[in-house]
Amino acid sequence: MKILIVTQYYSPEQFQINEIAPELVRRGHEVTVLCGVPNYPKGIVFQGYETADNCKQKEREYYKQTGVRVIHAKQHPRGHNPFSLLRNYFSFVKNSKEVIRNLSPNFDVVLGYQLSPITSMYAAVEYKKLYGTPLMYYTLDLWPVSAESILKSSKNPLMLPVTWMSRKIYQSADRILVTSLPFMDYLSRVNGIERERMGYLPQHAGGGMMLMDLQKETHNGCADFMFAGNLGKGQRIDVIVNAAAELGARTDYKVHIVGDGSMRSSLETMVKEKGLTNNVVFYGNQKRDDMPSFYKKADVLLITLRGNNEVGNTMPGKLQMYMTTGKPILGAINGAANEVIKEAECGACVDAGNYKGLADLMKSYIESPEKYKDCGANARRYFTEHFTFEHYMNGLERELQTLIAK
């Protein structure tokens, strides 16, 4: 297959599509990725990508390494304010569509790796309009509901055109794969997508840590909890901080927060105001290859997500990654993730936003860790049965081939 992947975010930005595209090449397919100039999450262009010539050099190097042809569309960096973020969104729409008009008409299929914003898929829609090529989305973020976090309210007057735009973009697809089953209900109800046009393909996680011994290196008489990932508003890390505040400034636990994002500064302020600087530690972004050494510090992994709309029913890819570590998982999260944690018997979960309930779970581990002794093995077993990279790639390849054959 000749596959065109459209995604606003790609390597060296850390998203799972970075593993998917090279694997498609290894399976014998020709892959081109159209993406933006990397600047996520800090809103600053990555070193080595500052100019068009720099990007061309990086594209040549990446092709030699992976066989994936990458084309960077110019875009305004995300910056640090809503105006700059909107410029980022719209500049990618404009410039990615210009790139599309200069591409070969010979692709067999277009795969839109659909994160936020939904406008990042306009280039994929443009290619389909020009050449009639079948279009598939892999939908990780739901729209228009995801726009509520940007517009601050579902009652914002701008939600009306955003809803119209989202419907048009989704309805342009021939096939939509979703990462969580509740997505199907929302896409059908809000965007008018027929059930037969949708399929379920949960995110994968690399299995590299499955065979690693990530048991805690030293038993320091302290329960070490860890959150690893994006520190955005939707992740509700404030629930973890408030849970720590319920436990208080005691010496028998620590919370390690590994990652970066728009809420980091306010979370650090929150920790200081609550007198928890000895209990809650921030490490910033870390390279993926360095993460095993961080997981070794942890007894338990924490997962939280906003729960006031359909976004809170998703199953973040973080959950699958956590499962590969063989650690118990405690969560304050709704929907599919809540169900999987309970079904896998890999930890315990309360509803999204319930910081007191999460504090009770953390206290339970601190006082009786033996209750969770089988959770890590259960997590790895469930992952092997449902979430391996090979399982994911077989499903994606099959879906693409079926769509082309129609």
Question: What does each model-identified segment do?
Answer:
Residues 1-57:
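N-terminal subdomain of nucleotide-sugar transferases
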Residues 14, 86-96, 109-146:
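An aromatic- and histidine-rich active-site surface loop
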Residues 156-213, 220, 280-282:
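Donor nucleotide-sugar binding/catalytic pocket of nucleotide-sugar-dependent glycosyltransferases
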Residues 174, 279, 295-312, 327:
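Acidic donor-binding loop of glycosyltransferase active sites
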Residues 218-244, 256:
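Conserved donor-binding/catalytic core segment of Leloir-type glycosyltransferases
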Residues 256-258, 265-292:
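Nucleotide-activated donor-binding/catalytic signature segment of Leloir-type glycosyltransferases, i.e.
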Residues 357, 364, 371-386:
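A short, well-ordered alpha-helix in the C-terminal region of glycosyltransferases
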